[in-house]
């Protein structure tokens, strides 16, 4: 006799639900088709047919989905959650207040911060070797290789393969005169690919320090980095980068060797020879190490040793070298301890496309390597990233808001073409939001198959964990992504000076609009900012961070270090935060880049830009103001996929460039921005008075964005100086 809790009963129930799902999905697809073209033979008017069919659709969907997959019962202070994800802590009390007013994660059992995930992985050197053991020398790094038949599957190298290559490269560094120890910096100037990781772990074998050079730092910044870090050797991925560095050899006396990951040209050989720089391929470098007879014992780094100097291109001024130790990077990976339901294991695969010079990417990869997971690289071309993701079918996806915003805009532009689709889509989102509020994360329900399946399949159909950060993500976009993906989607907040993240949202927490709770390796306090009327007594102020994740200072720059880390060890981020009633952090403003208008009002342009990006027409914006002016203006890059069809419906046709020059189009965009701003609670002085529509996107390539996709405000001001001056000249 079977009981309701027996496996046989559950198996039967799952099978019945699956069959019902299949039948009803087909039924409702037929209803959707019917609504798109209601029959003229019916005695009922078309709108009645549509309403009845829509009601049947939603009713059946609700009935089938009701209560499905709710497998737990977890109570906190009288509130019960019945989803399949157990809340890590009480969702209504996610942080604990210490006597000094600072906060730590409620996940911690005492007041001691957590320094690492695993006892046997306290450095990155130890971490990858732990992964090799746990995976039993499983696949580690993959790249797509094109076959004769045109297919391009991922081809994998094992942990031992990569460690052997790293061994040879590290020995080759010795052959080329690179000293052992933390005083020697190795430069790398390349897109994400296996050789990047090989170089990184080769660097750690003898406690050297890896210094990434961003692709678009510009020549002046690159020269500064090479000289300040006294870099002797740079690993480049292509001829163009190597050639670019050689142009400035006379300004970089320390540069002695260039290694290129592709075949050398005769021109490059001749140029490098004339400048006294050795040049060889990455294959040559590996062979040099493999054939070397002198193979000294490794000098593994300690947790306190530097792992990397990560130069922040910054939105202003000269690059600053953020010194991060092995302990720092390992401690930031502790945030992954939050994920008990969706934690990374040896069976996981991650897609790597965010720049490896970006610490968010490196932290997540370091955790993958600690547990024996595998990482597949995109082909270096963002235009075919979707194809790479579909081929890899990753389970872990780090992503930036810009990618998710584009996905949302694309889906919504399609959904808005049909009243029925919009009704069904909104209902599905609402239902899923209710389900998620109960900590129920699923992708096998009725609406998952009917409405969201294509979106999931666009990411390969296997994603379990999606991590986003680096910029704010609007509430509606985050809720959409969580509903559509049917997996754990978390948002983090931080900066390079605290490695990557100092807060991360709890898995299963569906409440959007915050950036999560303090990670276990950090503590946070809010400090008064009286000029902006933010006070700690009101649970608001500048976000200050302390703990194992705080950087050791700016390389060879004690003055800026002292300006950023106070005497008690608190990192002052320049961001304004507010504690929510649930004990999570919400970023509400920016202390940096604030300016005062002529009437004395302070303005935080980044806050305004983050609101305007919610306008359906806006892809990017740059809000500008001056101390001698009374109002704000903005440069706006419209979303081409939304603007063109929307204007056609209004009877305005033309190319994207032509539309950007059309005054009627400008008015439509400005009106929508002002409506969004008003709804978000912007004061009148925070609303822009005029805009210029630019058909040129802000990008890393045109030097208007940092590699972490933040606006370079001085560059934008210079780039659009003519348009800004003209707008102010026309205003009364």
Spans of model-derived segments:
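Structural core segment of the AMP-binding/adenylate-forming
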Residues: 2-4, 13, 22-96, 205-287, ...
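Conserved AMP-binding/adenylate-forming core of the ANL superfamily
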Residues: 116-119, 137-201, 218-223, 281-283
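Conserved AMP-binding A3 loop
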Residues: 156-160, 307-333
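Conserved AMP-binding/adenylation subdomain of ANL enzymes
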Residues: 330-352, 356-449, 462, 484
């Amino acid at each position: 006799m079977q009981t309701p809790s027996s496996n046989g009963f559950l198996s039967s129930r799952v099978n019945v639900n699956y069959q019902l799902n299949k039948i009803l999905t087909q039924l409702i697809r037929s209803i959707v088709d019917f609504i798109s073209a209601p029959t003229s033979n019916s005695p009922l008017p078309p709108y009645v047919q549509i309403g009845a069919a829509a009601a049947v659709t939603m009713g059946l969907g609700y009935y089938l989905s009701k209560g499905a997959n709710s497998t737990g019962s977890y109570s906190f202070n009288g509130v019960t959650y019945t989803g399949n994800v157990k809340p890590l802590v009480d969702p209504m009390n996610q942080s604990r207040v210490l006597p000094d007013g600072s906060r730590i994660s409620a996940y911690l059992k005492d007041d001691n911060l957590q320094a690492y995930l695993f006892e046997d992985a306290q450095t990155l050197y130890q971490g990858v070797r732990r992964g090799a053991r746990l995976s039993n020398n499983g696949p580690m790094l993959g790249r797509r290789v094109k076959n004769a038949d045109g297919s391009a599957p991922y081809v994998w190298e094992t942990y031992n393969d990569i460690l052997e290559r790293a061994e040879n490269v590290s020995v080759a560094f010795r052959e080329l005169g690179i000293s052992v120890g933390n005083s020697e910096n190795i430069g790398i100037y390349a897109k994400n690919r296996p050789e990047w990781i090989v170089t990184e772990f080769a660097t750690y074998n003898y406690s050297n320090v890896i210094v990434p050079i961003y692709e678009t730092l510009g020549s002046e910044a690159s020269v500064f980095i090479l000289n300040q870090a006294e870099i002797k050797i740079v690993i480049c991925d292509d001829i163009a980068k190597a050639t670019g560095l050689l142009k400035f050899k006379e300004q970089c006396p320390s540069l002695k060797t260039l290694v290129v990951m592709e075949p050398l040209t005769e021109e490059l050989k001749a140029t490098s020879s004339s400048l006294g720089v050795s040049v060889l391929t990455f294959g040559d470098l590996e062979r040099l190490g493999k054939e070397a007879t002198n193979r000294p014992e490794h000098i593994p780094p300690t947790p306190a040793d530097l792992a990397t100097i990560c130069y922040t291109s910054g939105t202003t001024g000269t690059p600053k070298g953020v010194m991060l130790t092995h302990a720092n990077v390992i401690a930031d990976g502790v945030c992954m301890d939050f994920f008990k339901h969706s934690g990374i294991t040896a069976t996981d695969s991650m897609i790597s496309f965010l720049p490896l010079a970006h610490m968010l990417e490196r932290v997540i990869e370091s955790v993958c390597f600690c547990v024996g997971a595998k990482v597949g690289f995109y082909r270096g071309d963002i235009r075919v990233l979707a194809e790479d993701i579909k081929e890899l079918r990753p389970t872990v996806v780090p992503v930036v808001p810009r990618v998710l915003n584009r996905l949302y805009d694309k889906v919504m532009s399609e959904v808005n073409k049909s009243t029925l689709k919009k009704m069904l889509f909104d209902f599905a989102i609402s239902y899923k939001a209710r389900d998620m509020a109960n900590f129920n994360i699923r992708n096998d329900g009725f609406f998952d198959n009917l409405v969201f399946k294509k979106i999931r399949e666009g990411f390969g159909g296997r994603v379990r964990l999606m991590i986003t950060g680096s910029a704010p993500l609007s509430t509606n976009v985050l809720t959409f992504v969580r509903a559509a993906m049917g997996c754990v989607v978390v948002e983090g907040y931080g900066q390079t000076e605290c490695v990557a993240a100092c807060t991360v949202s709890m898995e299963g927490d569906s409440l959007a609009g915050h950036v999560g709770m303090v990670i276990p390796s950090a503590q946070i306090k809010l400090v008064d900012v009286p000029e902006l009327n933010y006070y700690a007594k009101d649970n608001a102020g500048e976000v200050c961070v302390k703990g194992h994740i705080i950087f050791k200072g700016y390389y060879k720059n004690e003055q800026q270090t002292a300006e950023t880390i106070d005497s008690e060890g608190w990192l002052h981020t320049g961001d304004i935060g507010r504690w929510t009633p649930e004990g999570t952090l919400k970023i509400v403003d920016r202390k940096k880049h604030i300016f005062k208008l002529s009437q004395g009002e302070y303005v935080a342009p980044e806050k305004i830009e983050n609101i305007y990006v919610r306008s359906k027409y806006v892809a990017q914006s740059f809000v500008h103001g001056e101390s001698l002016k009374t109002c704000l203006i903005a440069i706006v890059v419209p979303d081409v996929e939304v603007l063109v069809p929307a204007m056609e419906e209004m009877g305005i046709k033309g190319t994207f460039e032509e539309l950007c020059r059309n005054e009627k189009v400008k008015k439509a965009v400005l009106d929508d921005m002002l409506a969004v701003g008003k709804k978000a609670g912007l004061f009148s002085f925070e609303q822009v008075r005029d805009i210029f529509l630019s058909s040129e996107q802000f990008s890393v390539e045109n030097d208007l964005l940092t590699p972490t996709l933040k606006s370079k405000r001085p560059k934008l001001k210079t780039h659009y100086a003519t348009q800004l001056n003209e707008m102010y000249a026309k205003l009364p």
